[in-house]
């Protein structure tokens, strides 16, 4: 059975490589034509692009005080309870640890 599978895989990969090769040919022709129009050489011409000026960003001076959930008492309780629940294993899961 191994030989049959190997032949089937080889046949499929061969046809895929052929299709990719056929698809790459027109791309090379178009790229060559564009290079010929640009100056007759196969090398790409370097064009310098002017640098854009940096944008000025306004930074707010007033600090915004938002209460994080971890800083409040209810947030701490929620985090503590969530940590305990993640350690337990449900009875229906069947994924107990055997040491």
Swiss-Prot record:
Main location: virion
GO cellular component: virus tail
One Pfam family linked to the record: VirionAssem_T7
Location in the cell: Virion
Protein's GO biological process: viral tail assembly
InterPro entries (UniProt xref): Phage_T7-like_viron_assmbl (IPR024281)
Keyword Transmembrane: no
Functional note: Plays an essential role most probably in virion tail assembly. May form a scaffold around which gp11 and gp12 polymerize. Gets ejected from the infecting particle into the bacterial cell.
Family the entry assigns: Belongs to the T7likevirus protein 7.3 family.
The name this protein goes by in its record: Protein 7.3
Lineage, uppermost ranks: Viruses, Duplodnaviria, Heunggongvirae, Uroviricota, Caudoviricetes
């Amino acid at each position: 059975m191994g030989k049959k599978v190997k032949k089937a895989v080889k046949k499929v990969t061969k046809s895929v490589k052929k299709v990719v090769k056929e698809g790459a040919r027109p791309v090379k022709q178009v790229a060559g034509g564009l290079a010929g129009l640009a100056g007759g050489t196969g090398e790409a011409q370097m064009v310098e692009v002017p640098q854009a000026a940096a944008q000025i960003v306004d930074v707010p001076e007033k600090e915004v005080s938002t209460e994080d959930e971890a800083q409040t008492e209810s947030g701490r309780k929620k985090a503590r309870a969530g940590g305990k629940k993640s350690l337990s294993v449900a009875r229906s899961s069947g994924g107990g640890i055997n040491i």
